[in-house]
Amino acid sequence: MNSSSVDSNRVEVQDVEAGPETIESTEDEERAVPHLVKLAKKFEVNYDAFIIGCYSDLGIQETRKAVTVPVIGPVRASFAAASVFTDSFGLLTINEDVLPGFERKAAEIGLREQLTELRAAEVPVKTIIENPDQAMHSFKEVAVSMEVETLIPGCMSFSFLFAERGIDEVAGIPIVNPLFSTIRIAESLIL
């Protein structure tokens, strides 16, 4: 998904020019941040807001300091959206290594109690991109065992896949798609 129109606003995806091919660890995040900040500075005059394209909210603080437009992170946006209409939500992400960071972010914004289940599908980002059916199978296999009122896919590659396929529930559990959460929050800030 390279661009999309949401109402009268236009959403465009810009890729960094260098850095890791996918973000699957803290080390990948650290290597990607300088490239993200550089990209935001380069395009600041062209856009009214930026959405971090990785679910981890990588580089959000650094990017906010570097530009004057709003910078929205999918973790916080999706946690906030889920908390608005449910008392408990779960997060299903790509691997177990990233779970502590999401737990910490939920605590930072006061939603740790509502984030009742954190799980990993153990699916590399590259698999989501190159073999989406296999990735969806792995996601569903874990989701079916989760006991939550709503579920957040904790990877933007999953979010794009769900958007492209019109998926709004998995295993009978409603999905809060971080892609849509971040877009709507960004829109509300630039009206």
Question: What residue ranges belong to the model's regions?
Answer:
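Glycine-rich, highly charged phosphate/nucleotide-binding loops
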Residues: 25-45, 132-142
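N-terminal glycine-rich anion-binding loop in soluble enzyme alpha/beta folds
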Residues: 1-34, 93-132
